[in-house]
Amino acid sequence: MESVVRRFAAACAAEDPEALLEILAADVVLVSDGGGRVLAPLRPIRGAVEAARIAVTLMSAAALSIEEVNGRSGIVLRRAGRVEAVVSLEVSESLVTRIWVVLNPDKLAHWLNHGNGADPSRG
């Protein structure tokens, strides 16, 4: 699973939806939670092409790091040193079948309260 998470992060960092399509299941679902406080899709996004477009857009110009999210590898997005989103993936047979993107600042409290959301690799 971690290799799929790394490929997902690399494709998003490169803003390369075609590379992302290689690891997305055709019927992948992207669910985002902005909590009404930040801009995020209001409904689940279904299908690889649209999910790839949304994922790349959400993660563009962000510093991405692979970190433990809900007990498994996930992706933390930072801009200007602040956590803006946490991404968790469900993987089946080496393909991403579900993408959860938490953008809601209230739900990011754990990440924001540990080092102010700063990148832990920066010391």
Descriptions of predicted regions:
Residues 1-123:
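C-terminal and inter-domain tail/linker signature
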